[in-house]
Each structure stands twice: as C-alpha cells, then as structure tokens.
Amino acid sequence: MASLFIIMDKRFAVFASSDKPNNCSRKNMFFLKNIIVLSNYLYLLYKAWIVCTTISLCCDFPLFNFLFIAIPYFTEILYNDSSLLWFLFVSLCFITLSFQSLEI
C-alpha cells in the first residue's frame, strides 16, 4: 500500500515537471494532486486504525491481536522503511498492555 503512494508521488512529480503545461494538463495535475492528498489521509487513517485496534484488543486476546497486527506490518516493512517505526510503536503498546493485563 505504501509503495502505491510512492509510485503516485513519483508520477505526479514527473507530470508536474512538464515544460509547457496547457489548461488540460493543469486540470489533470490539480486532480492528481487531490487524489494523492486524499490517499495519504486514508493511509494515515489506516495506521491510526491499527494502533487503536492494538490498544483496544491487547488486553483480551493478546496472541490473536499480535498476529492480526503483525502480518500487515511485516508486509509493509518490505515496501517502506518508515513502517518499521510504526511497527515498533505498536509492538511497544502490545508488550506494555500485555504486562498490564498480567498484573491485574
């Protein structure tokens, strides 16, 4: 998913660097820019959903939740290095909440 946004950003950069943009290409460029911005917001919502799911489910089903969260992150790490930071954050939340559930 992250690789799709990188490809879209690269295509937008190539498209925006044309020497003589006419009205049609300006409209297309504006439309493409809006699509990229919207897709980036959707990607951030996806990340926030994973973090919230981790926090809400960790105490009840730690092993199931870890597998549910780890699989998307391991696949994203292959495509995007910045996902590693998100994976470490979610893993830290998982470990912290697991220890808290054991103490209770």
Swiss-Prot record:
Chain ranges passing through the membrane: 30-50, 54-74, 84-104
Secretion signal, residue range per the UniProt entry: none
Places the protein is found: Endoplasmic reticulum membrane
Membrane topology summary: Multi-pass membrane protein
GO CC, any one term: endoplasmic reticulum membrane
Stated role: Has a role in meiosis.
Protein name listed in UniProt: Meiotically up-regulated gene 150 protein
Taxonomic source organism: Schizosaccharomyces pombe (strain 972 / ATCC 24843)
Gene: mug150
